[in-house]
Design a protein with these regions (language model features):
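Acyl-CoA/ACP chain-elongation machinery
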Residues: 1, 31-48, 80-90, 107-161
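Solvent-exposed alpha-helices and their adjacent loops that cap or buttress functional pockets
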Residues: 1-3, 20, 70-71, 105, ...
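Condensing-enzyme catalytic core mediating Claisen C-C bond formation in acyl metabolism
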Residues: 1-70, 76-77, 195-262
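Buried hydrophobic packing segments
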Residues: 7-13, 61, 96, 129-139, ...
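Short, glycine-/Ser/Thr-/acidic-enriched flexible segments
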Residues: 15-17, 33, 83-85, 118-120, ...
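A glycine- and small/hydrophobic-rich beta-loop-beta segment
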Residues: 48-77, 82-87, 92-110
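Internal helix-turn-beta structural module
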Residues: 138-186, 190-191, 200, 206
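Extended non-globular C-terminal regions
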Residues: 263-282
């Protein structure tokens, strides 16, 4: 039976997270998609995402991470798509190892591999969402998970001197950043660098002050606690785990409100916001 998993990531600007008291699980240090080559097989993985390192030590990836205080040596892990196919595993490993050398990672500095599917199974459409979520969990725990299914490693991967596959969990402590990639599937590759949420806190402290940072922490922790309570109440049947939104936040009032026209206007207006009624108004 065919099935798909999925997931949702709430992505906001830092000032919005501060204003709303949103918990921050990670900071997007760099994100890009790439064509990975013309292949006879639609899901065949290529090396297109290696272009993330275009320019080497002078690449946009290196410069963007530097703005957050992260160097190539600070990237502790890579969460790989790892489909255990003859094509994907060697290609993805070669890509990250080549990239590490290109952007100036110190020889001998290990780059630990997280094979997310060995932990959660293959979500297919939601696979990289699982990978990014796994990186945010690493920021919290400081523990790199092992690949319990690692019975043998493709001999081709021996060439990749930075890459390390763990057979047991490894506590590494504070992690500054990690990479996540998804290769192939429509000749498109996705590449993201996720940075520890400490980068957000440092930015708030520098731009808004310690008082603003402490206020944000209090509000964010309250949101986390409320979310955990709601989850547990839902698991015990005391609250709904899902409540549908009425008509996608558009409504028909039988008079001058045309949901179709209001939706078009909302999509074209950069200042469009939900009204206090919970709907987009005309």
């Amino acid at each position: 039976m065919e099935s798909q998993g999925g997931g949702t990531i709430l992505l906001t600007r830092g000032d919005i997270a501060l204003k709303l008291g949103l918990p921050v699980a990670g900071v997007v240090g760099f994100v890009h998609s790439y064509a990975d080559g013309a292949h006879t097989s639609i899901p065949a993985p290529g090396l297109g995402a290696l272009a993330a390192g275009m320019g080497g030590k002078d690449s946009k990836l290196v410069h963007d991470l530097a703005k957050l205080g992260v160097t190539p040596d600070d990237i502790a892990v890579v969460s790989k798509h790892d489909t255990s196919t003859n094509a994907n595993d060697p290609n993805e490993s070669e890509l990250h190892n080549t990239l590490a050398h290109a952007i100036g990672r110190t020889d001998g500095n290990p780059l630990f591999v997280i094979s997310q599917k060995s932990l959660t199974g293959h979500a297919k459409g939601g696979a990289c969402i699982f990978q990014v979520n796994g990186l945010t969990q690493l920021f919290k725990s400081g523990v790199v998970p092992a690949n319990a299914a690692l019975d043998c490693v493709d001999p081709k991967l021996k060439r990749d001197d930075h890459m390390v596959w763990l057979r047991e969990p490894l506590k590494v402590g504070s992690v500054k950043a990690g990479l996540a990639t998804s290769l192939g599937f429509g000749h498109v590759s996705g590449f993201a660098a996720i940075v520890n949420p400490g980068a957000f806190e440092a930015s708030v402290a520098n731009t808004a002050g310690e008082d603003a940072l402490n206020e944000w922490r209090d509000r964010a922790n309250a949101r986390l606690a409320a979310g955990q309570r709601r989850l547990e109440e839902g698991m015990m049947g005391r609250a709904a785990l899902y409540e549908p939104i009425d008509n996608r936040r558009f409504h028909e009032d039988g008079r001058g409100y045309d949901a179709h026209e209001v939706e078009k206007a909302m999509l074209l207006d950069p200042n469009a916001r939900l009204a206090s009624t919970g709907y987009f108004e005309a």
